[in-house]
Amino acid sequence: MEHVFAVDEIPDPLWAPPPPVQPAAAAGVDDVGAVSGGGLLERCPSGWNLERFLEELDGVPAPAASPDGAAIYPSPMPAAAAEAAARWSRGYGDREAVGVMPMPAAALPAAPASAAMDPVEYNAMLKRKLDEDLATVAMWRASGAIHSESPLGNKTSLSIVGSILSSQKCIEGNGILVQTKLSPGPNGGSGPYVNQNTDAHAKQATSGSSREPSPSEDDDMEGDAEAMGNMILDEEDKVKKRKESNRESARRSRSRKAARLKDLEEQVSLLRVENSSLLRRLADANQKYSAAAIDNRVLMADIEALRAKVRMAEESVKMVTGARQLHQAIPDMQSPLNVNSDASVPIQNNNPMNYFSNANNAGVNSFMHQVSPAFQIVDSVEKIDPTDPVQLQQQQMASLQHLQNRACGGGASSNEYTAWGSSLMDANELVNMELQ
């Protein structure tokens, strides 16, 4: 099982030693001092400046002047620590473990020529350098967080972080080169990307052997791996259950839609049957309405005919009742029958002329045409046979007609009554009716 160590405790046997560099005096604050010898030590200028500032605060003696005029700082590491580091390097050399480069006791990097600098500017410069180093450390930690959050190994993101870290300046420390597994190379493998640690010189100077993984750590890592695997399995189970629930909900939704569609189809079929029955009833009603309309027209024609007949009957009744009322209005009068007769004969009321209308109602009977009289009443001048009852009756009728004409005030009425009497009945019929 592959173990993960801290960055400052990982020795890399595959790390190639850097090429030797000739010592040179530092010309400014940003120059880097180097030491020649078997162990190459590199330190960024911000680290040297910070160490110098701490030495000045602690009261370290001033640096000695070199023959070329540059100031040489004494080694900040004690002699015992340097000897222990060298012994550890010699003891583990057969294992090809490149752990800690031995710190040289002499030939330290030269300080800048312009040692006398404004303290305010110097402090501002140190603060700026410190901020840059802290930003670099924060980016390095972010790269470690990205690696821990992506268990599948996102090589693209790690390579990007590694390139960013390689482009930054080294952080403050003793300049020991450490190869990390968290920063892959450009081709995806382990590359020569360097991460510096601030307190690496203190830890590796005091440590006499490399750190061995303990069984408890192995158990912890195995437990973490099992927990991670369980988490992955739980996530897979959740995804699988979610998919199954989605399929089940979709199936239920489809079944509900199918049932709803079936109900709608049944309702449509019922509505179609009802519609057809209603259409048949409507056709029957239309047919009955047309037949009733025809019957209504026939009945209206019959009603008009009956109304005409009723009007004719009413006119006939009016004609008869009007003649009777006129006859009742004429007073009873006696007429002498003959000079030779001993007694007078009274005139009866049942005069046949009562059945005819007077002259005023003659215009109402518009459907009866007037006809000329067929006979003339026998003149009273004529000689009458007193023994003949017919002649006597005619004489009485003539006298009665004469009196009626005089009472009505005109001869036209007599002519009309004569015309009606002559058109309806003859003289014999009139006499018979009078005798009855």
Swiss-Prot record:
GO terms for molecular function: DNA-binding transcription factor activity; sequence-specific DNA binding. Its main location: nucleus. Residues 215-225 have a biased composition (Acidic residues). The keyword Endoplasmic reticulum does not apply. Residues 264-278 are annotated as: Leucine-zipper. It holds the Pfam family bZIP_C. It is found in: Nucleus. Residues 238-257 are annotated as: Basic motif. Residues 1-27 are annotated as: Required for transactivation activity. InterPro entries: Basic_leucine-zipper_C, bZIP, bZIP_sf. It comes from the Eukaryota. GO terms for cellular component: nucleus. GO terms for biological process: positive regulation of DNA-templated transcription; regulation of starch biosynthetic process. Residues 236-299 form the bZIP domain. Transcriptional activator that binds to the DNA specific sequence 5'-TGAGTCA-3' found in seed storage protein gene promoters. Involved in the endosperm-specific regulation of storage protein genes. Can activate the expression of genes encoding for the seed storage proteins glutelin, prolamin, globulin and the allergen RAG1. Functions synergistically with DOF3/RPBF to positively regulate quantitatively many seed storage protein genes. PANTHER family: BASIC LEUCINE ZIPPER 63. This is bZIP transcription factor RISBZ1. It comes from Oryza sativa subsp. japonica.
